[in-house]
Amino acid sequence: MTMRKRIAFLAGAISFDNQNRVLGGVLKRASELDMDVYVFTCFVNYDESEENKVGAFRIIDLPEFDLFDGVICMKNSIQYEPAVNSLIARIKKSKVPAVSVDEKVDGMYNVGISDYSSQKDIVEHLIETHDLKKINYVCGILQGKEGRERYNAYRDAMEEHGIPVCDNQIYHGNYNRESGRKAVEQFMKYNMPQAIVCANDAMAIGAMERLQQNGYRIPEDVIVTGFDNDELSEFFVPSLTTVDRRQELLGKNAVNLLFERSDDVNVQIDTKTIYRESCGCNMQPAMEIKDLRMEYQNKCLIYEEALIH
């Protein structure tokens, strides 16, 4: 009897929609190929204390990689440098084929997207289509590739259009909804911008929540955009302009790279910018649809808060 091939999948903050969707793609493709997937992850958030991160990320010390036929690692999601460094060293030492999702790692296959061009498309859309100039930005974690590239894209788009950016137009967040809420509180101390561009959907939704609580209309008073195309982005009121990273396809391609042994060690997946109501595009939903979306949105927010706490 032939033994089924085994894949180790490693990621942090699995409660985030991005990691879940990539894992979904991995599981679907592995099932099609009659392979087993062993998942090593935790529910740690990016803003956890050092002590909590040390404990939570011990989970990624468990797998003996020599026992697997391939490894898929979401390095960007493990926001604790000692754990990341130890993990990468152990994977390389094992000599087992490995794929890094999103961030390139020497000696591994890589599947990812262009965070830079995807984020730049949104900023340029606001400048060129909506004729905006005062555009603020809510960063992700700049130590990671995706946070750094998205921030650089915002700065470059503004500079190329001759639009200056002040320090008080930037808020340094950590990908959760609370970062979006706090960003709005900071921006309210100054003149409110025409638009707030966020490095992910969770922060964008947090920003929209706080704006609405303070009487701002979206997009009439302030435009908001996100990144990731999380499930809630489509159903929030107003629906969120965002970038579809096609995470499930990333996961499927990660499995393919492990076993097809392609000469191209770096595979880039095309993203899709989705223009919705939060930037003023594609308005006019029927009122009953809005009511249903609001009900769904509230249920999702309650569920996500329960996961966090």
PLM segments and residue spans:
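Hydrophobic alpha-helical segments within soluble ligand-binding/sensing domains
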Residues: 88-89, 106-137, 149-159, 176-185, ...
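Flexible loop/turn connectors
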Residues: 33, 183-284
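Alpha-helical recognition/docking segments in bacterial nutrient-uptake
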Residues: 1-124, 187-188, 202, 309
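Intrinsically disordered, low-complexity acidic/proline-/asparagine-rich linker or regulatory tail/stalk regions
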Residues: 65, 283-309
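Conserved acidic residues
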Residues: 69-70, 133, 194-195
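Short beta-strand/turn micro-motifs composed of small residues
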Residues: 11, 41, 73-75, 100-102, ...
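Short beta-strand elements in bilobed, periplasmic/extracellular small-molecule ligand-binding domains
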Residues: 30-49, 134-137, 155-178
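Alpha-helix capping/helix-boundary segments
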Residues: 78, 143, 150, 202-204
